[in-house]
Amino acid sequence: MKTTVGSRPNKYWPIVAGIGVVGLFAYLIFSNQKHSTESGDNIHKFANGGSYRDGSKSISYNRNHPFAYGNASSPGMLLPAMLTIIGIISYLWRTRDSVLGDSGGNNSCGEDCQGECLNGHSRRSLLCDIGXSFYHCSMAIVYISKQYTYGDWSLLLSRSELCEDLWNRGYEPRSYCGHPPLAEVPFWGISDVGRFNQCFEYSS
């Protein structure tokens, strides 16, 4: 005889629905306040401040904030804001070469460019910058041998260790501006040689 156990009904959904309905009504009540037009003694209230005097009774109201009732926009600030934005864009455009490494409009790199055209950055710092994720390489982890003599290539190195090791063996990241012929990998221990060749070149 086959026995099936039914799923337990969810008894919390009415509570959640009730809290949602009450919260919705509370939001509508507090967000749709009617503007009071009369005081407790039936003296008219001015919509935007002012004062009222009737015999011995006098009442005064503070004026509304200048930004009230849709007056928050300031047309007089449009021109200064536009000039500020134009100034920032102009500054970034003029300094793009120092940021992009002379690759934004004034590219003087030749076919033999090995990375010298990147202003302000040494090739070693580019190679060993972990945050650059191996320059533009999509390779996350590479297996490389630390003990080349014994052929122990199963050792997993961190990216910083791999950067230092590749630099010491004469490798540099490929440059964006020029694609010199890539050298063959002269040692054991590289996993996925094709992806390695897309990222580094032998320069020494």
UniProtKB/Swiss-Prot annotation:
Keywords assigned: Host cell junction, Host cytoplasm, Host cytoskeleton, Host endoplasmic reticulum, Host membrane, Membrane, Transmembrane, Transmembrane helix, Transport, Viral movement protein
Ranges of the Cytoplasmic topological domain: 1-11, 94-204
Bilayer-crossing regions: 12-32, 73-93
Subcellular location: Host cell junction, Host plasmodesma; Host endoplasmic reticulum membrane; Host cytoplasm, Host cytoskeleton
Any one GO biological process: transport of virus in host, cell to cell
Membrane topology: Multi-pass membrane protein
Coiled coil regions in record: none
Lumenal side: 33-72
A Pfam family recorded for this sequence: Plant_vir_prot
Entry GO CC: host cell endoplasmic reticulum membrane; host cell plasmodesma; host cytoskeleton; membrane
Keyword presence, Transport: yes
Misc. comment: This protein is translated as a fusion protein by episodic readthrough of a termination codon. Readthrough of the terminator codon TGA occurs between the codons for Gly-131 and Ser-133, thereby producing TGB2' minor translational readthrough protein. The genome of this virus consists of three linear, positive, single-stranded RNAs encapsidated in separate virions designated RNA-alpha, RNA-beta and RNA-gamma. Three proteins (alpha-A, beta-A and gamma-A) are translated directly from these genomic RNAs and the remaining proteins encoded on RNA-beta (beta-B, beta-C and beta-D) and RNA-gamma (gamma-B) are expressed via three subgenomic messenger RNAs.
Record function comment: Participates in the transport of viral genome to neighboring plant cells directly through plasmodesmata, without any budding. TGBp2 and TGBp3 are necessary for intracellular delivery of TGBp1-containing vRNPs to plasmodesmata. Can gate plasmodesmata and increase their size exclusion limit. To a lesser extent than TGB3, induces host actin cytoskeleton network thickening, which probably plays a major role in virus cell-to-cell movement.
Subunit structure: Interacts with movement protein TGB3. TGB1-TGB3-TGB2 complex formation is enhanced by ATP hydrolysis.
Family membership noted in the UniProt record: Belongs to the virgaviridae/benyvirus TGB2 movement protein family.
Full protein name: Movement protein TGB2
